[in-house]
């Protein structure tokens, strides 16, 4: 059985990809309450991802500097210790979206195989793709293991999975925050007062709304900055490509 990872990123040339990532203003998730959460790592956590079916993980392409050395860990909560719930996969194939462009449209898929076969448990389970596009004000949540310190503070990387509730930001407000940088493939979420945000190391982590994954942490202006909400990949815009890719690798 293969585990396949599908990677997407929508960014802008002057934006800051959130490679080191963080959840600012969040709290520890209930253990294994996000069974779809994946940790991408090179022996240490580097980016997030999300399990979307029995063999695919979704994340953002800018996380994969050396994809063949990357491991995909499922069933994690506490990164410090072995909990007995973890299931590990390794990458063996990368497939780029035909319109790949790091500055504007960055989509990649990679397939992985392992002698360790993952199975659904209380700690490992997929989440559905969106059945609609996000609407302003929709309550959502984001999770990750990224830095929890604000800009200018000493970096603090939590070992316990962090969660945070965020609303979808109105498209007009999103475009005002990032003039000429927001495309139809992006969606903003967060608080305009800068009180809560996802950031670097949380890249690729899922934005979950109404039990479906609506977006992936992508980029932003700093972290938890007033008037600059987080920018996410808008997954509803990529459903056709995702479905075609999954069909090509049954």
UniProtKB/Swiss-Prot annotation:
UniProt enzyme class: hydrolase
UniProt keyword Membrane, yes or no: no
Entry GO CC: extracellular space
Residues flagged as site, Required for specificity: 197
Chief location category: secreted
Cellular compartment(s): Secreted, Extracellular space
A GO molecular-function descriptor: serine-type endopeptidase activity
EC number(s) stated in the UniProt entry for this protein: 3.4.21.4
Keyword Disulfide bond on entry: yes
Name used for this protein in its record: Trypsin
Source species of the chain: Pleuronectes platessa
Lineage, highest ranks first: Eukaryota, Metazoa, Chordata, Craniata, Vertebrata
């Amino acid at each position: 059985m293969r585990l396949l990872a599908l990677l997407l990123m929508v960014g802008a040339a002057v934006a800051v990809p959130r490679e080191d990532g963080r959840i600012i203003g969040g709290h520890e998730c209930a253990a294994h309450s996000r069974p779809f959460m994946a940790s991408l790592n090179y022996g240490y956590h580097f980016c997030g991802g999300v399990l979307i079916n029995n063999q695919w993980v979704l994340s953002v392409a800018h996380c994969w500097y050396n994809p063949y050395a990357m491991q995909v860990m499922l069933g994690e909560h506490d990164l410090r210790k072995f909990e007995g719930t973890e299931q590990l996969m390794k990458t063996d194939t990368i497939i780029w979206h035909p319109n790949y462009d790091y500055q504007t449209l960055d989509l990649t898929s990679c397939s992985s195989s392992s002698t360790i076969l993952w199975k659904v448990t209380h700690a490992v389970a997929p989440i559905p793709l969106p059945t609609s596009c996000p609407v302003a004000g929709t309550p959502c949540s984001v999770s990750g293991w990224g830095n929890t310190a604000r800009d200018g503070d000493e970096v603090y990387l939590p070992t316990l999975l962090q969660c945070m509730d965020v609303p979808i930001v109105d498209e007009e407000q999103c475009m005002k925050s990032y003039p000429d940088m927001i495309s139809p493939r992006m969606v903003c979420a967060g608080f305009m007062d800068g009180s809560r945000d996802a950031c670097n190391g949380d890249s690729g982590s899922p934005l979950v709304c109404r039990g479906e994954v609506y977006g992936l942490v992508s980029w932003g202006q700093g972290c938890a900055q007033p008037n600059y909400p987080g920018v996410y990949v808008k997954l509803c815009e990529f459903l056709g490509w995702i479905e075609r890719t999954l069909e090509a690798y049954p």
